[in-house]
Amino acid sequence: MKISLHNKRQRGDQNQNMSVFNVLKPLLKGSNSFKVKLNGFLFNNVSTITIRTLMKTHKGTAKRWRRTGNTFKRGIAGRKHGNIGWSHRSLKALTGRKIAHPAYSKHLKRLLPYH
């Protein structure tokens, strides 16, 4: 059996359409009619797939800040290394946690949307 180049292209297009239909088939199963409103007009039997993009977490902020109720807390900087020769009094002042300033918490909520 000999198939011409033109027929191969047509068969390829049909296979492509079938593969797209097969991908959408599980999404379309179970509902007989879709209603879509576009520019004030109502279309029946039109299927649309909408994908909502996710907001990204700022990883540097996520490693430094933790959420506590409505605000955020962080550790105090300056205790990790290079502390030889420092007095115990000055090092003790760098212990504990700090609460975020209310003006900065809106910015932190944007950087950490899922925390």
Swiss-Prot record:
Organism of this sequence: Saccharomyces cerevisiae (strain ATCC 204508 / S288c)
SUPFAM superfamilies the record matches: L35p-like (SSF143034)
Q: What is its main location?
A: mitochondrion
* Alphabetic keyword roster: Mitochondrion, Ribonucleoprotein, Ribosomal protein, Transit peptide
Q: Name one GO cellular component term.
A: large ribosomal subunit
Q: Which cysteines are joined by disulfide bonds?
A: none
Q: Record's Gene3D superfamilies?
A: 4.10.410.60
Query: The organism sits in which domain of life?
Result: Eukaryota
Give the family from UniProt.
Answer: Belongs to the bacterial ribosomal protein bL35 family.
PANTHER family assigned: 54S RIBOSOMAL PROTEIN BL35M, LARGE RIBOSOMAL SUBUNIT PROTEIN BL35M
GO terms for molecular function, please? Answer: structural constituent of ribosome
Pfam family membership, one: Ribosomal_L35p
Name of this chain's protein: Large ribosomal subunit protein bL35m
Cellular compartment(s) = Mitochondrion
Transit peptide span, please give it: 1-53
What is the annotated role of this protein in its UniProt record? Component of the mitochondrial ribosome (mitoribosome), a dedicated translation machinery responsible for the synthesis of mitochondrial genome-encoded proteins, including at least some of the essential transmembrane subunits of the mitochondrial respiratory chain. The mitoribosomes are attached to the mitochondrial inner membrane and translation products are cotranslationally integrated into the membrane.
Subunit notes for this chain? Component of the mitochondrial large ribosomal subunit (mt-LSU). Mature yeast 74S mitochondrial ribosomes consist of a small (37S) and a large (54S) subunit. The 37S small subunit contains a 15S ribosomal RNA (15S mt-rRNA) and 34 different proteins. The 54S large subunit contains a 21S rRNA (21S mt-rRNA) and 46 different proteins.
Q: Which GO terms describe its biological process?
A: mitochondrial translation
